Design a protein with these regions (language model features):
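Ligand-binding loop in jelly-roll beta-barrel domains
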Residues: 80-103, 108-110
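Helix-turn-helix DNA-binding motif, specifically the short coil turn and the N-cap/start of the second
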Residues: 220
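Short, Lys/Arg-enriched, Trp-marked, Pro/Gly-tolerant hinge/linker segments that flank
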Residues: 124-135, 148-206, 210-217, 230-237
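Short, Lys/Arg-enriched alpha-helical recognition elements, typified by the DNA-recognition helix
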Residues: 142-145
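Double-stranded beta-helix
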Residues: 101-126
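Generic protein-terminus/edge-of-domain signal
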Residues: 1-70, 87, 112, 126
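Short hydrophobic/aromatic patch on the recognition helix
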Residues: 72, 223-228
Length: 237
């Protein structure tokens, strides 16, 4: 059996285009067990992501958090958040990945009022549980969106209608107020990780040390180790 593998660049940004320039939306009816090492490895993307656990259970690692997702639960991953999914057995995890600009153009009032507060917030993810009323409403909308994608003829307009309903529920039920300190800490950690990953990529044929890797991001050796361990749970050397 051939296993799927996610492709990323040296900063761990996913390189695949989700959807098209005209319709930046993609639906993936995936079984994570069929990926290399039974996981969708560390990656990030500017797009928003919603995943639902229809069968099995999933361990999601988002930023510095570990989240157990049993059957019937889902998760929203915010734009730019480094994350990974892993499983211990076969699963069915339909998910959608789409650009924030699909909901509204960047220079519009809708984008400024309802999209920017979310993608610029300190909230990296939102777990969706069936026993919480508004979270369950989102899960129900997700299943409708999945059904539309599996129909013989794709219904982009119907998909958009459901996405806007979903986004309205998410926006109205969460505190998206920006915390500049939290944003700075999150972005600084991820920027440092990506800088060091870039350095490793550029010098992988050479004999490099932890001190050299840390210096590339202007941090201490202990700081470099902490960023690697807390974000991708491994050592850089």
């Amino acid at each position: 059996m051939d296993f799927y593998k996610i492709t990323t660049d040296e900063t761990l940004r996913e390189t695949v285009q989700h959807g098209s320039d005209h319709y930046p939306f993609a639906y993936y009816p995936e079984n994570i067990w069929e990926f290399d090492f039974h996981r969708i490895d560390w990656h990030w993307h500017h797009e928003l992501e919603f995943l639902y656990v229809a069968e099995g259970s999933v361990l999601c690692l988002a930023g510095t958090s570990k989240i157990e997702l049993p059957k019937g639960c889902g998760i929203f991953i915010n734009s730019g958040i480094i994350h990974r999914f892993e499983v211990q057995g076969s699963t069915f995890t339909p998910n959608i990945v789409f650009s924030p600009t699909l909901l509204a153009p960047e220079n519009s009032l809708i984008y400024e009022k309802y999209i920017i507060p979310v993608i610029n917030s300190f909230v990296p993810y939102q777990v969706l549980r069936p026993y919480n009323r508004w979270e369950n409403q989102i899960l129900q909308l997700l299943t409708h969106i999945f059904s539309l994608q599996e129909a013989k003829e794709t219904n982009e307009l119907g998909t958009m209608q459901l996405l806007l309903q979903l986004w309205n529920i998410l926006f109205e039920n969460k505190d998206w107020k920006s915390d500049p300190d939290s944003i700075h800490r999150l972005n600084h950690k991820q920027a440092g990780l990506q800088t060091m990953m870039q350095y490793i990529h550029d010098h992988y044929m050479e004999e490099i040390t932890l001190e050299m890797i840390a210096a590339s991001a202007s941090i201490s050796k202990s700081g470099a180790l902490h960023i690697f361990q807390s974000n991708i749970h491994c050592s850089p050397v």
